[in-house]
Amino acid sequence: YFIREIKDKNLVKSVKDFPVYVDSPLAKRATTIFCGDLRGYLDEEALALVQDGTHMFSFPGLHLTETVEESKLLNMDRTPKVILSASGMCDAGRIRHHLKYNLWRPESSIVFVGFQSPGTLGRTLLDGAPSVKLFGEEVAVRAKVVNFQGLSSHADHDHLVNWISQFKEPKPQ
């Protein structure tokens, strides 16, 4: 949603029309599901966008990768891009390959949007490690590492209380 808005408003002046890659088979399937009718699941702001014809999870330049080969090609192409990769703590999955090929590049940014537990690679990066070990190699951290608070996909306390309050008393068994 936010990336689509950034692209729509041309907020990244240095790269006119950067591509965005969702690099996770599960995220690809979830995105496909969310491209359906979501009217019963959206807040007022999101519903207004949909009613105006905005596609919440689709925009020009969005690419959904699925295969390992597609994922590997992203690291071989030096075109400026956004790669959205799963494994929030960076301890497994495709993100580790993206980190290996991009952490050492000062023009890269590694952006976290969720909590990083102590002892994870994600927390190590946020804590400012000068280098990390990936696939048996020491990789210098020259990329800018940032954490955006408030974008986690997990519900907060108020949302959880609101959700659970919608349930009726359980039926006797």
Model-predicted regions and their roles:
Residues Y1-Q173:
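Acidic/His-rich, metal-assisted hydrolase cores and their charged scaffolds
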